[in-house]
């Protein structure tokens, strides 16, 4: 048998699955432990769902279980955590939590929990050696435990959607926003992937329901971000480098960024964002800090070069981590927090009240050299739904006059594959009466191009992070209302989405739930879609891949003059 099996990301080996080491860099041991962590979590969920329905052990659910459910999923997202010891600790914490729940269960509740498998809720090992050995049993804890290819495909599609949802839920959680409804659904979906009584049709329904809850969790995170940090504003962001030492913060957790800015003010250093942290510059409660200098570098996959040039400490608040080469000059100045982790990298200290202590990072930054300037100029951010809707009259006026003919949603992820240059060429060759709506790190393929504007409206509108794809759904629904259309698919909006990891999966499922059809996904279709499941998505939702820029522009009707009236 192969050492591992993982096919959750776009770059999976040969488009079918990694079997000896992950293309992402994770070892077979790490892959097995991540599988075991999810198996452990499902055992916790088997009990917590019973208690939640019965209104029992509320304090335990709110105090420990809810956070565990989302954090365990988040740890297993592509490029989030490579630290086997951290994953082992999370497995042990889950076993302890499961046993704590079990001790409170009646015989009837135990029987209900065991319907997903007696082994799921009763297995137990204490030593790392035993846990590692058990994690190697792919037929029990791994993806391949499901023999039927189509059932496996649907179960994993749900799991990957859940992982993306959990990431967004954790960010909202960190900002004090939670939802009992969302936690209950996470349990339902986790256990749905263990329920052998569910047929393919029922799993398809659960997949779309996952998309429904994806919309809910993105709305929750949007509320969390804006209530704590203000509504994003159109903001120009410097992409050069200053003369002072700096700290580079990567990932997605805006609350960590807020705390870092507050703790580092008046310290003589600057704060820079990296990759998906770029949208932070649009939030009033973040941009008010004078030492919030700009954005440094490009998308996550190019970080080895960017981190070397930056010279100062780097903080990963979440994924995406690229394992450093052995002689990397920056590996002793990288810190992690939340679900992110890498062997040998330092952890950010967490205070008793849950706040972070960034003092060690700040002190290190003071003795580092300033970043090397590798580019200069500015890029514009801050076009989330509130900002775009405030311009609604201007947008509608330009649509009615014919100045704007089409919108192209190019949200999603960036990645290493050379095929992704397609998105740069696609953006460059769009008609001048077309506006790109983007979010996520896919933007790095074209956000530094000079694509101009249409009567003062930039031709690239950046809503923010991957979760801010929610903004384009809000905008689309508003435009549908303004133009009196019966179907959202009648709008002059094309969806050409780039995916890489599981947050893009929940965005896709959310769009499907909202009824959006004919979405194109690239640079390749997911390897975890079996032929039959892919056929269902094609026939029911019009899902398709990409071809060449020239062919796709024709296919999408993206030529001068095409639009709402054509």
Curated annotation (Swiss-Prot):
Q: Where does hybrid [4Fe-2O-2S] cluster bind?
A: 252, 276, 320, 413, 441, 466, 501, 503
Alphabetical list of Pfam families matching this protein = Prismane
User: Out of the domains of life, which is the source?
Assistant: Bacteria
Q: Where in the cell is it found?
A: Cytoplasm
Q: Which GO terms describe its cellular component?
A: cytoplasm
Q: Name one GO molecular function term.
A: peroxidase activity
Free-text comment on the cofactor: Binds 1 [4Fe-4S] cluster. Binds 1 hybrid [4Fe-2O-2S] cluster.
- In the record, which positions carry Cysteine persulfide? 413
Cofactor(s) essential for the protein: [4Fe-4S] cluster; hybrid [4Fe-2O-2S] cluster
Note whether rRNA processing occurs among the keywords.
Answer: no
Keywords, in A-Z order: 4Fe-4S, Cytoplasm, Iron, Iron-sulfur, Metal-binding, Oxidoreductase
Q: Does the keyword Metal-binding apply?
A: yes
Q: Which reaction does it catalyse?
A: A + NH4(+) + H2O = hydroxylamine + AH2 + H(+)
EC number(s) from the headed UniProt entry: 1.7.99.1
Residues given in the record as [4Fe-4S] cluster binding sites: 6, 9, 18, 24
Gene Ontology terms describing biological process: nitric oxide catabolic process; response to hydrogen peroxide
Write down the PANTHER family for this protein, in alphabetical order: HYDROXYLAMINE REDUCTASE (PTHR30109:SF0)
What is the purpose of this protein?
A: Catalyzes the reduction of hydroxylamine to form NH(3) and H(2)O.
Entry protein name: Hydroxylamine reductase
């Amino acid at each position: 048998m192969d050492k591992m099996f993982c096919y959750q990301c776009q770059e999976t080996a040969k488009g079918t699955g990694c079997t000896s080491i992950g293309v992402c860099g994770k070892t077979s041991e790490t892959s097995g432990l991540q599988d075991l962590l999810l198996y452990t979590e499902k055992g916790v969920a088997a009990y917590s769902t019973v208690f939640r329905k019965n209104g029992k052990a509320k304090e335990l659910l709110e105090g420990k279980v809810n956070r565990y459910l989302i954090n365990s999923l988040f740890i297993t997202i592509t490029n989030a955590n490579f630290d086997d010891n951290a994953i082992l600790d999370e497995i042990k914490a889950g076993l302890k939590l499961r046993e704590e729940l079990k001790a409170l269960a009646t015989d009837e509740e135990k029987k209900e929990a065991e319907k997903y498998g007696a082994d799921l809720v009763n297995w137990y090992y204490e030593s790392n050696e035993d846990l590692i050995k058990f994690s190697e049993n792919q037929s029990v804890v791994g993806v391949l435990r499901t023999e039927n290819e189509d059932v496996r495909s649907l179960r994993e599609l749900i799991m990957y959607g859940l992982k993306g949802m959990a990431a967004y839920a954790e960010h909202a959680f960190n900002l004090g926003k939670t939802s009992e409804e969302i936690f209950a659904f996470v349990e339902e979906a986790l256990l749905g992937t263990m329920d052998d009584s569910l047929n393919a049709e029922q799993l398809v329904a659960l997949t779309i329901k996952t998309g429904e809850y994806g919309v809910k969790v993105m709305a929750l995170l949007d509320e969390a971000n804006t209530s704590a940090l203000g509504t994003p504003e159109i903001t120009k962001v410097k992409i050069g480098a200053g003369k002072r030492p700096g700290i580079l913060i990567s990932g997605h957790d805006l609350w960590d960024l807020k705390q870092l800015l507050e703790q580092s003010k008046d310290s003589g250093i600057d704060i820079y964002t990296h990759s998906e942290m770029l949208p932070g510059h649009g939030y009033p409660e973040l941009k008010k800090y004078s030492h919030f200098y700009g954005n440094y570098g490009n998308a996550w996959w190019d970080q080895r070069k960017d981190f070397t040039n930056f010279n100062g400490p780097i903080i990963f608040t979440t994924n995406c981590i690229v394992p450093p080469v052995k002689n990397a000059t920056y590996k002793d100045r990288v810190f992690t927090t939340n679900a992110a982790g890498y062997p040998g990298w330092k952890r950010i200290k967490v205070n008793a009240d849950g706040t972070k202590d960034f003092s060690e990072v700040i002190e290190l930054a003071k003795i580092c050299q300033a970043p090397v300037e590798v580019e200069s100029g500015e890029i514009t951010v801050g076009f989330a739904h509130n900002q775009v809707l405030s311009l609604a009259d201007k947008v509608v006026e330009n649509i009615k006059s014919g100045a704007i003919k089409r919108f192209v949603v190019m949200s999603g992820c960036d990645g290493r594959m050379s095929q992704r240059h397609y998105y740069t060429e696609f953006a460059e060759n769009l008609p001048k009466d077309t506006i790109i709506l983007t979010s996520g790190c896919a933007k790095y393929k074209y956000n530094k191009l000079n694509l101009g504007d249409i009567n003062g409206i930039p031709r690239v509108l950046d809503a923010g992070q991957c979760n801010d794809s929610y903004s384009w759904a809000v905008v689309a629904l508003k435009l549908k209302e303004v133009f009196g259309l019966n179907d959202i698919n009648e709008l002059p909006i094309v969806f050409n989405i780039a995916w890489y990891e599981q947050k893009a999966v929940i965005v896709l499922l959310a769009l499907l739930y909202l009824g959006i059809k004919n979405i194109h996904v690239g640079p390749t279709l997911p390897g975890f879609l079996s032929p039959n499941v892919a056929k269902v998505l094609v026939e029911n939702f019009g899902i398709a891949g990409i071809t060449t820029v020239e062919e796709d522009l024709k296919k999408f009707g993206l030529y001068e003059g095409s639009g709402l009236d054509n």
